[in-house]
């Protein structure tokens, strides 16, 4: 099993020193879901929400969150992201919204946390915008789908 990289020999948390690492191309994809009543989902799809376009707002929130992950998650490095994409899909069969994020850069550390943060904050934004209509929406699961690049190479979730 791998060692925890953010814990030093005395058990203290610290930010990993990546100064000696080579810059490589890295990408990560994550997903999140927001479950809701059919009426709430229909309101979003039909654009009837009094606060405006729920998907557009959630997309922008996810993008902004990815860019600020280092301010939200302790010990994360500030990264120069070259791509952040957030896609939202209404899944009427399951009464939910599926969010998929993709983050990319050329750098010394991975972008998994940025992708996970983008998907999570997009989901939280949907909840925030729709909570007046439905308070019992369910967020989750949230998970990493794929990681490309870095020392550990390629990871992809099995479907």
Curated annotation (Swiss-Prot):
Active site: 128
Keyword Translocase: no
Keywords attached to this entry: Lyase, Molybdenum cofactor biosynthesis
Biological process per Gene Ontology, one example term: Mo-molybdopterin cofactor biosynthetic process
Entry EC number(s): 4.6.1.17
Disulfide bridge partners, by residue number: none
Catalyzed chemical reaction(s): (8S)-3',8-cyclo-7,8-dihydroguanosine 5'-triphosphate = cyclic pyranopterin phosphate + diphosphate
Function: Catalyzes the conversion of (8S)-3',8-cyclo-7,8-dihydroguanosine 5'-triphosphate to cyclic pyranopterin monophosphate (cPMP).
Family: Belongs to the MoaC family.
Subunit and partners: Homohexamer; trimer of dimers.
Name assigned to this protein: Cyclic pyranopterin monophosphate synthase
Organism for this UniProt entry: Photorhabdus laumondii subsp. laumondii (strain DSM 15139 / CIP 105565 / TT01)
Protein's gene: moaC
């Amino acid at each position: 099993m791998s060692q925890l990289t953010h814990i030093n020999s005395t058990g203290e948390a610290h930010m990993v020193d990546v100064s000696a690492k080579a810059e490589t191309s890295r990408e990560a994809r994550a997903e999140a879901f927001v479950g809701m009543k059919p009426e709430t989902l229909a309101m979003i799809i039909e654009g009837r929400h009094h606060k405006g376009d729920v998907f557009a707002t959630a997309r922008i929130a996810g993008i902004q969150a990815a860019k600020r992950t280092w301010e939200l998650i302790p010990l994360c490095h500030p990264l120069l992201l070259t791509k952040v994409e957030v896609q939202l899909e209404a899944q009427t069969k399951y009464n939910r919204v599926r969010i998929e994020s993709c983050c990319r850069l050329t750098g010394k550390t991975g972008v998994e946390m940025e992708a996970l943060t983008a998907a999570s904050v997009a989901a939280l934004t949907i909840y925030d915008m729709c909570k007046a209509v439905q308070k019992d929406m369910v967020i989750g699961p949230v998970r990493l789908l794929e990681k490309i690049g870095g020392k550990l190479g390629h990871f992809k979730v099995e479907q």
